[in-house]
Amino acid sequence: MIKKLENILFINTGGGICDALSSLALLNYINEIFSIDNLFYYSTDMDKFWFENKLSEFKPKNLITIKNFPQHFGFLYEHRKVSKNLINLFNFDKFDLIIDNQTRLKNSLIYKKIPHQQYISPCVNFLLSKPFILTKKNKNVTLRLINYFNRIIKKSFKPSYEIKIEDKFINTAKKIMSKNNKYIGFSITAGHPTRNKEFEIKEI
C-alpha cells in the first residue's frame, strides 16, 4: 500500500447530512494513517454539498467536495460510458486510491472504471478491491473499511467518533428541546427526495 497518497477519491453514496457526518470517523482515520494531499469527496447529496455549508466546521482541511460529477453518478447504467473520462475533470491521470464506501455491485463496477492505482470497496466482501485481502465484512459501516485498512498496513488503529459540537448548536437544541416541551422525533431511513414515502400520524 502506498504510504504517500497525493489524490484520494472517497465515494459516499449516502446523500443525507447524517451520512456525511457519519463518514467523518473514516475520513479522519485515513488522514491519520496516510499522508494525503487532496481528499476528494463525492456524495449523491442532490447538490447539498454538506461540508461546504452546514458541516463546514467539521470539514477536514484537505477535503475537496466534487460538484461536477453526473447527477446520481453510479446509479444509472449509462454512467459506465462516462466513468473513465471523469478523470479529465482533474489535473492528474489517475487517483492514487479510490475508497468506495458502499456495497452495490452495479455502482462499484461503474466507480472502478475511474482511472486509479488502488481501489478499496466492501462490495462482495472486498472482492473488487486492489489490494485484495480475504476477510469477512464487518456489519458496522465504518469499521468494515477501517478493519480492512488495518489488515493492509498491519496495525490496529481505532477510529475516533468524537465530534466537537459548537455551543451555538447546543444552545439551540436546549431551546427547542427544553424540559417543559414534549416532542416526537422521526428518523426515516432512505429518506432521499427521489423516494416517495407516506405515513399517517394517528393519535395514541
Language-model segment annotations:
Residues 1-204:
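Catalytic machinery of carbohydrate-active enzymes
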